[in-house]
């Protein structure tokens, strides 16, 4: 049995109902966060809440609740579901508007939905994934964690249909990120990642990995990375909230092809796992 929260009321998940006139349903007029929880502890919660706050500000959605109330409700959902490994999904839409109109009515009450998704232990050893290079066809405001994810869905469908796990997106000859992850490359033992002005989401895990790498004497370079450089990368990995460090062993559309995750990637992965288990 799972429990979710709708507008700060917790019920069994199957007993919750959202209006079909909610702007999140009609327009995708909503933002979200995904938070890793281990044994009831929400990892990097403050960072996720800060990004959620920024997303809300970017779409000019003013919450009618206190941030502390949201934080408390997230923790309640994590604890009431009592699973060792969870992803807590938080979605806030602009609210219910009975007459469909692109222009929001004034004084709408946001819809706040929080649920728990059971996930695998992030420490499960990962053999590495296969990724597909693809032109980035998403909208330009990728810094907003919007629920309007149709382009991402289509990317995942395409990758899966061709037997791959993820898509690595590029635009105008430069690397961006994955469809649901950030991108890292080891080049000459330095860790390279597309900078935030490369049309990417400011990933919480990405930021933590940069800090951890620097603290462990790994030189990190954030820059605009030409697509061609992926051919000569020593190692490639992706990062996400629920999976942490995801080694990439093959990239279709490039010369990058290896038989196993690289040592530098695995070292950083272990450092990251130590961080999340002691946070």
Located regions from the model:
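Ordered, amphipathic secondary-structure segments that act as subunit-interaction surfaces
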Residues: 80-92, 99
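Helix-start/capping segments and mature chain N-termini
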Residues: 1-76, 80, 98, 102-279
């Amino acid at each position: 049995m799972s429990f979710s929260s709708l507008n700060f009321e917790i019920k069994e998940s199957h007993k919750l109902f959202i209006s079909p006139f909610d702007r999140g349903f009609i327009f995708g007029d909503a933002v979200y966060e995904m938070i890793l929880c281990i044994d009831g502890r929400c990892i990097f919660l403050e960072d996720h809440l800060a990004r959620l706050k920024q997303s809300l500000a970017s779409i000019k959605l003013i919450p009618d609740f206190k941030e502390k109330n949201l934080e408390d409700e997230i923790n309640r959902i994590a604890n009431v579901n009592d699973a060792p490994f969870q992803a807590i999904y938080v979605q806030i839409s602009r609210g219910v508007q009975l007459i469909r109109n692109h222009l929001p009515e004034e004084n709408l009450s946001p819809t706040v939905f929080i649920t728990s998704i059971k996930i695998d232990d992030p420490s499960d050893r990962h053999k590495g994934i296969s990724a597909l290079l693809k032109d980035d066809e998403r909208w330009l405001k990728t810094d907003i964690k919007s629920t309007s994810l149709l382009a991402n869905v289509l990317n995942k469908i395409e990758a899966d249909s061709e037997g791959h796990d993820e898509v690595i997106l590029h635009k105008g000859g430069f690397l961006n990120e994955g469809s649901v992850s950030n991108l890292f490359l080891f080049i000459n033992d330095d860790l390279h990642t597309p900078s935030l002005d490369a049309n990417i989401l400011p990933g919480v895990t990405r930021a933590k990995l940069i800090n951890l790498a620097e603290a462990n004497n790994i030189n990190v370079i954030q820059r605009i990375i030409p697509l061609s450089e992926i051919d000569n990368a020593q190692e490639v990995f992706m990062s996400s909230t629920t999976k942490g460090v995801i080694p990439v062993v093959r990239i279709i559309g490039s010369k990058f092809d290896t038989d196993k995750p690289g040592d530098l990637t695995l070292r950083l992965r272990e450092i990251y796992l130590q961080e999340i288990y002691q946070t």
